Amino acid sequence: MKQYLDLLNHVMEKGSDRGDRTGTGTRSVFGYQMRFDLEEGFPVLTTKKLHLRSIIHELLWFLKGETNIRYLKENGVSIWDEWADENGDLGPVYGAQWRSWPAPDGGHIDQIANLVKGIVNNPNSRRHIVSAWNPAEVDEMALPPCHCLFQFYVADGKLSCQLYQRSADIFLGVPFNISSYALLTMMVAQVVGLKPGDFVHTLGDAHLYHNHFDQAKLQLARRPKPLPFMRIKPDVKDIFGFTFDDFELIGYEADASIKAPIAV
């Protein structure tokens, strides 16, 4: 995807070298935006092969409201292993905030259910927002949310989504985030009876770890291929009813994966 390669190149050429929490060191820019028209194909990297199974199962795990990695491990997904405790728990991370945000009266708010209901009943609202950043619980999370707030927008029979990501690991994290939120947009669009529009990805601290420079240069030397298309079973009309087998990526051709260390 040209949008992603442009981001990589921009950070390599224009970024500032800074320290970071992990001690690895980063080169970063503050404030960057990419836009993907979901009618033009499914936004997934073709300059390195991504593990789509992990992307889909992680999203389904979020939507289940789960915060233990048991479901992920059962489905061969290890991307959260480094942050889980000995019991597999992560604290009140994404799933808890999306599905069970604590309310002042002692109850809980299901932001995803409210989102779908709001789009159906009042599509022109400017309040179709889900937040994973809960200041009251952020210190209890194994990893505070990097992709922390998203908003939906309806126009001309299409549903678009904008994600704000406060912290963006460009080489390892951002490719997953692009595909994950593009897929979420398509899923929500299907259950509310709209066509997918744009996915807009807004980054706060967009950074490339110093030990990812060689991998980034290798990827920048590759030429992007045509985007594939995502086929979703059309009979699923409940946002919580999707399973892994409901998705099929058609025509995905990509260069070999590029390994890089995770900064924990």
Curated annotation (Swiss-Prot):
CDD domains: TS_Pyrimidine_HMase. The active site is at C146. Pfam families: Thymidylat_synt. Its EC number is 2.1.1.45. (6R)-5,10-methylene-5,6,7,8-tetrahydrofolate binds at H51, D169, A263. It catalyses: dUMP + (6R)-5,10-methylene-5,6,7,8-tetrahydrofolate = 7,8-dihydrofolate + dTMP. Gene3D superfamilies: Thymidylate synthase/dCMP hydroxymethylase domain. SUPFAM superfamilies: Thymidylate synthase/dCMP hydroxymethylase. It is found in: Cytoplasm. Pathway: Pyrimidine metabolism; dTTP biosynthesis. NCBIfam families: PRK01827.1-3 (NF002497), PRK01827.1-5 (NF002499), thym_sym (TIGR03284). Homodimer. Catalyzes the reductive methylation of 2'-deoxyuridine-5'-monophosphate (dUMP) to 2'-deoxythymidine-5'-monophosphate (dTMP) while utilizing 5,10-methylenetetrahydrofolate (mTHF) as the methyl donor and reductant in the reaction, yielding dihydrofolate (DHF) as a by-product. This enzymatic reaction provides an intracellular de novo source of dTMP, an essential precursor for DNA biosynthesis. Belongs to the thymidylate synthase family. Bacterial-type ThyA subfamily. This is Thymidylate synthase. The lineage of its organism: Bacteria, Pseudomonadati, Pseudomonadota, Alphaproteobacteria, Hyphomicrobiales.
